[in-house]
Amino acid sequence: MAFIKALAEYEKMRADVTATPESLEYWLFDKQAAEVLFAITDGKEVGFALYFNNFSTFLGKAGLYLEDIYVLPQYRGRGIGKALFAELARIAVERGYGRFEWACLDWNEPSIGFYRSLGAVGLPEWTTYRLTGGALMKLAGASNDICE
């Protein structure tokens, strides 16, 4: 939880964190909805990356989607973030995935520069949409027998 809270602080989204240790245990271990890598230096967890599968109908292949990555500020600039990305890329290649994707806040210039240094390209023609809470429930209530 400490990494999640620290990431939320950095992203100016602390109030949005509703995860609990119990909800993380349920979704990550019981449901296996995502996987987590930890960066460990001198026996201490100093960063993490949470990822899961997505799928491209155009490629006809699964992909790797990075939901969150965070390295403690005092450990940045030491290659830890790059090592996490390299390991995620290795996993994607090993599993035969067609791509490795993630989103980044548009104001996060340090991260954008870092991602570009890795060879990643932004997708300015795409806009992310999200349904949560009441909007998600309302739309779910509109479901009918057309979809199977």
Where in this protein do the model-derived segments appear?
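A short helix-loop-beta-strand connector motif used in the catalytic cores of GNAT acetyltransferases and
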Residues: 26-38, 65
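Conserved beta-hairpin
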Residues: 34-49, 72
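Conserved acetyl-CoA-binding loop-helix of GNAT-fold acetyltransferases
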Residues: 71, 77-90, 113, 117
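Conserved acetyl-CoA-binding loop of GNAT-fold acetyltransferases
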Residues: 89, 97, 116-125
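Conserved GNAT acetyl-CoA-binding A-motif
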Residues: 92-104
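Conserved beta-strand-loop-alpha-helix junction that forms the acyl-donor binding cleft
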Residues: 101-111, 123, 130-134
